[in-house]
Amino acid sequence: MLALTYHRSVPAFALVRASGGNPEVATSALSMLHLGDVPEPELPAAGWMRVLPSLSGICGSDLAAIGGHASLYLDPLTSYPFVPGHEVVGVLEDGSRVVIEPALGCVVRGIEPVCPRCAEGRPGLCYNATEGPIEVGLQTGYCASTGGGWGEVLVAHPSQVHAVPAALTDEAAALIEPFACCVHAALRGGASKSDVVVVVGAGTIGLLTVAAVKMFTPPKRLIAVAKHPTQRDLALALGADAVIAPADAFQRIRFATAARRLDGVDRSLLLGGADITFECVGRADSLSDAVRFTREGGVVVAVGMPGDERVDWAAIWQRELTVMGAYAYGSEPKRKGRRTFELALEAAPELHLERLVGPLFSLGDCRDAIAYAMSAGRLGAVKVAFDLRG
């Protein structure tokens, strides 16, 4: 089958990182990413299914790995070479449309009894990511055994497969996985109707977090920080009460929360601020901003995949902030244990998520696709994806 594969190569990673993630280097013959014919993944156990991807998104975590600036923390939790692509809508061999829930927890791996985290309905935190009939991997798209959405075939356990409602186009369904991540983040943040909430970043994760917060935990006021015009328009359409530019964010959040400003030697801080801030970029500057924007005793939710970033912990310490990660999905205790993917699939039709998707590229145009995705915001795009429908 035709697929893009990502290979573990320290020299290639160092070369790409030294280039600053230049797309010409990151997709060259000297990089970790290769396009070619590879064997189809084998069914690892009885009951597993073959899935033919239709659309598969290019995620920020994919770009971080391809661009050489991903955190190496995840390397031992990954097997190589793998076919990327964990945002997938596809078809089963009987023609039915499905989306894939990528987490490779105990149930998927056939491990009994399940580990404590899987028993809690948190397969993304599975203790057994190295065990069972498939190789190491937290998710489909980072596991050598399963394939991924950037190939013509992947394999999935029945527990990973969700039927796509007729009301959803393929384009909208391609965003169910990241939307489920954001639903999980919104529920972890737990905003109340008296809270002021700030979402930092308005790429795919930021925009979908705006939508998830508005739908599942609507606050008193929801403010999005967005850099580009298309992002600002979409943030408002998805439920933000106000959208502000990064350069104006500190002052605008100060006024919105009636906070006081104190100027120091090299930076300013707020006395007061947002009750909850969702950080949806994963860079040091945006993480630092999220901390600065949040009131004493408030909550910062890290939703965007961070790299090895430096953050000044003094503010976290002195302000007694609660900083929490929001990774993947599972079952949501605040929704009577319902699966995050089910919540996302039910909520998605009214959001018209297809407006966030495009342009679409063939696998053969992967170099153009990656380059476009690396500059998506500036180019007026949100989710660039591969189209394998033929």
PLM regions: where:
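Hydrophobic/small residue at the entry helix of a nucleotide-binding pocket
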Residues: 181, 205, 231
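NAD(P)H dinucleotide-binding glycine-rich loop of Rossmann-like/cofactor-binding domains
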Residues: 75, 86, 106-200
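Helix-to-beta-strand junctions that scaffold the AdoMet/dcAdoMet cofactor pocket
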Residues: 294-295
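Adenosine-nucleotide cofactor-binding segment
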Residues: 196-202, 215-285
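C-terminal capping/lid region of NAD(P)-dependent oxidoreductase domains
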Residues: 2-4, 13-18, 267, 271, ...
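Glycine-rich beta-strand-centered segment in the early N-terminal region that forms part
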Residues: 39-56, 71-120, 165-167
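C-terminal substrate-binding/catalytic core of Rossmann-like NAD(P)-dependent dehydrogenases/reductases
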Residues: 255-267, 271, 309-359, 367-368
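Glycine-rich Rossmann-fold phosphate-binding loop(s) that bind the pyrophosphate
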Residues: 178, 201-205, 305
